[in-house]
């Protein structure tokens, strides 16, 4: 599977936003903006927003373009549909639900078969969760201290579209998130514009 190879903190600083949520991601020796003072063209700004959105979800360009194409064919608002689809990916939801401390760790957990969706093992990171889907750890995975610690001591943002049962170690997608609820800093309209002109 292809991976985004640029170091995470360096990528966050290049994009000008903390796409990984780590408190030290934007730290850098010296002063001034990492991206410098060069003024971007309209195309450059659109490209930057696209790169931000890809980085938030750790999705490679080929797969990202498939999400864009599907969103453009939908009857909803393209940018909102795009981000909703990315947000509901299993790897992202495993992170949002608190089973993992990062999307990268969440993706590894999914790939290694640690998660169940509605009681069935799912090992496809891009699997799209649907309204009412329940996510839980496999019985053997419940013995892994790190996963339990992640879940019970989760320090991330509490989201209204996720319901957590700490005692049962289960979570459920109780609503399809609106754009306003999804905690990412990106102008999805500019992302759509970037692909519309290509």
From Swiss-Prot:
The gene is rpsD3. NCBIfam families: PRK05327.1 (NF003717), rpsD_bact (TIGR01017). The keyword RNA-binding applies. CDD domains: S4 (cd00165). Keywords: Ribonucleoprotein, Ribosomal protein, RNA-binding, rRNA-binding. Residues 88-148 form the S4 RNA-binding domain. GO terms for molecular function: rRNA binding; structural constituent of ribosome. One of its GO terms (biological process) is translation. GO terms for cellular component: small ribosomal subunit. SUPFAM superfamilies: Alpha-L RNA-binding motif. It holds the Pfam family Ribosomal_S4. One of the primary rRNA binding proteins, it binds directly to 16S rRNA where it nucleates assembly of the body of the 30S subunit. With S5 and S12 plays an important role in translational accuracy. Belongs to the universal ribosomal protein uS4 family. InterPro entries: Ribosomal_uS4 (IPR022801), Ribosomal_uS4_bac-type (IPR005709), Ribosomal_uS4_CS (IPR018079), Ribosomal_uS4_N (IPR001912), S4_RNA-bd (IPR002942), S4_RNA-bd_sf (IPR036986). PROSITE patterns: RIBOSOMAL_S4 (PS00632), S4 (PS50889). Part of the 30S ribosomal subunit. Contacts protein S5. The interaction surface between S4 and S5 is involved in control of translational fidelity. It comes from the Bacteria. This is Small ribosomal subunit protein uS4C. It comes from Alkaliphilus metalliredigens (strain QYMF).
């Amino acid at each position: 599977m292809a991976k985004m190879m640029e170091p995470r903190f360096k990528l966050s600083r290049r994009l000008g936003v903390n796409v990984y949520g780590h408190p030290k991601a934007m730290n850098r020796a010296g002063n001034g903006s990492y991206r410098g003072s060069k003024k971007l063209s309209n195309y450059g700004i659109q490209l930057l927003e696209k790169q931000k959105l890809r980085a938030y979800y750790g999705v490679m360009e080929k797969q990202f373009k498939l999400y864009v194409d599907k969103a453009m064919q939908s009857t909803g608002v393209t940018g909102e549909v795009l981000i909703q689809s990315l947000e509901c990916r299993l790897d992202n939801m495993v992170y949002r639900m608190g089973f993992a401390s990062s999307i990268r760790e969440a993706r590894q957990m999914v790939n290694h078969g640690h998660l169940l969706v509605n009681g069935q093992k799912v090992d496809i990171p891009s699997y799209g969760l649907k309204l009412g889907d329940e996510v839980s750890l496999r019985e053997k995975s419940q013995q892994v201290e790190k996963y339990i610690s992640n879940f019970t001591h989760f320090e991330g943002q509490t989201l209204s579209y996720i319901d957590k049962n700490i005692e049962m170690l289960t979570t459920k997608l109780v609503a399809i998130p609106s754009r306003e609820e999804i905690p990412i800093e990106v102008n999805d309209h500019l992302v759509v514009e970037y692909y519309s002109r290509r």
